[in-house]
Amino acid sequence: MAPTEMNIERKVEADVAVIPNDGKRAYVTFLAGNQDYWMGVVGLAKGLRKVKAAYPLVVAMLPDVPKEHRQILVAQGCIIREIEPVYPPENQAGYAMAYYVINYSKLRIWEFVEYEKMIYLDGDIQVFSNIDHLFDTPSGYLYAVKDCFCEGSWSKTPQYKIGYCQQSPEKVRWPMNSLGHVPPLYFNAGMLVFEPNLLTYEDLLQTVQVTTPTSFAEQPIPSTYNLVLAMLWRHPECIDLDQINVVHYCAKGSKPWRFTGEEEHMDREDIKMLVKKWWDIYEDTSLDYKTFVENESKLNPIVAALASKESGCDGLTSLAPSAAKSNP
């Protein structure tokens, strides 16, 4: 099924001042549905403020996100970009978990061509150190972190079943005699540094229409920029928590806003500590957008002037509508 034409953003009412930037760089995340994933996006927005990120957070959002959730995100300083779904081809409908069908729509972020470079972060990610320097990586590459095959989403693959993982391939050797060539490197798509480009978007769209999901050329960056929690118990020798910049709460039962500690591995002290760190940020009212801007304005007259100039705004939209339109 061909994707539908992308809508221009819809204006969302809110009484929050808008602080514009040059429009060249931004963080971006994705949201769909009416469940509680908006809480993850709020946590991410506040986390980026806590580490003094210099660039805004854009939320690529499907039309089914309720108005109430949109208003919450706008009030947290997020830039709302409504997108239309991208549907997987019929031959891939049963490839992986059901929510992966929704995840095809993330390809739309390559259409955000008003930005020169973006850093994509899943909504269940939290940043604990400033990562703005990743915007300065050489252009022309997709930057990502190698995935861990020990994570549950790989459970139906040969890699998972035999205990082979590209994070520590020396632990379990790949049986070439029975399974053929060693699998190509795969990255975890929860964190990406990329350059929006319409030709790239069309190439990606054509690729998923005719092939099964696979890896494509990228430049690896250290796992400190996307710690998949399964690494803590599968590859502890690879992890130094003091050096971690970005944590991906993707293991079963690890979403902080749903955390009970009852699922497997969730009773670990390091997991509890990381969940607490997420909640400390989420519940910190000084990191709420309006409060943060007011406090920063007292210290920075330039910020104060910008906030005053924009104080009449009743909504927050992206800096410019995307020029992108998909083919009918």
Swiss-Prot record:
Mn(2+) binds at residues 122, 124, 248. Its main location: cytoplasm. SUPFAM superfamilies: Nucleotide-diphospho-sugar transferases. Keywords: Carbohydrate metabolism, Cytoplasm, Galactose metabolism, Glycosyltransferase, Manganese, Metal-binding, Transferase. It comes from the Eukaryota. It is found in: Cytoplasm. It catalyses: myo-inositol + UDP-alpha-D-galactose = alpha-D-galactosyl-(1->3)-1D-myo-inositol + UDP + H(+). The keyword Glycosyltransferase applies. Galactinol synthase involved in the biosynthesis of raffinose family oligosaccharides (RFOs) that function as osmoprotectants. May promote plant stress tolerance. Belongs to the glycosyltransferase 8 family. Galactosyltransferase subfamily. This is Galactinol synthase 10. It comes from Arabidopsis thaliana. The gene is GOLS10.
